[in-house]
Amino acid sequence: MDVDRRLTHVELLHAPGERELAARAFALLGCTVSDSGRHWFTAFIDTNLRDYSNNLFYASEAPAEQLAIEAAMTDLGDEWVEMVRAAPQNSPHFGLRVGTVEEHRTIIDNIRNASENDVELRGRIEVLGLFPHDAPDAIATNMDQAFIWTNVIASGPLRLGQVIELQWHLNREPA
């Protein structure tokens, strides 16, 4: 199916000195990272495609102006992060769909492992909630959902972090 309208990319930021850590966060999400050493690097959502214009993430270092604003936020973000942890589905987020339930589970397991065992990622990335399609508290009955929080990459203030909804759909749409 040819589509004229689509989401082309999401631009995310990382803290100074954390470019490699940001690339690792994308890899944990199942993306393929390509870094040409320019201002930004690319993370492909579909690991089989190399379309630099569609269906991807870009990541670059947060500008000094943003970091100054974030420094002024002091403890104001702590309550926000706690709200996000309690109800991630009610926070600003974007969704990322994977192709198989096995891939969904593997990504979740890898993120949990990194959040517990990786010194650089402990406290920086975590699975906030799982909502299987057949659970009594399912948000959606047509997909399994996992909500992931990280402050390694974000499309807004790094201090507040980024919520990413990882989805596996029971029925794939026709191509």
Residue ranges of model-derived segments:
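Glutamate identity and glutamate-enriched acidic tracts
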Residues: 11, 18-20, 46, 61, ...
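Core segments of cupin and vicinal oxygen chelate
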Residues: 1-66, 129-133, 148
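Extended charged low-complexity segments that act as oligomerization/scaffolding linkers
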Residues: 52-55, 59-72, 77, 81-87, ...
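Vicinal oxygen chelate
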Residues: 1-3, 5-17, 35-37, 43-45, 51-52, 72-112, ...
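Short amphipathic alpha-helices in soluble, non-transmembrane regions
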Residues: 22-29, 106-115
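Residues in well-ordered beta-strands of folded domains
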Residues: 58-59, 95, 149, 167
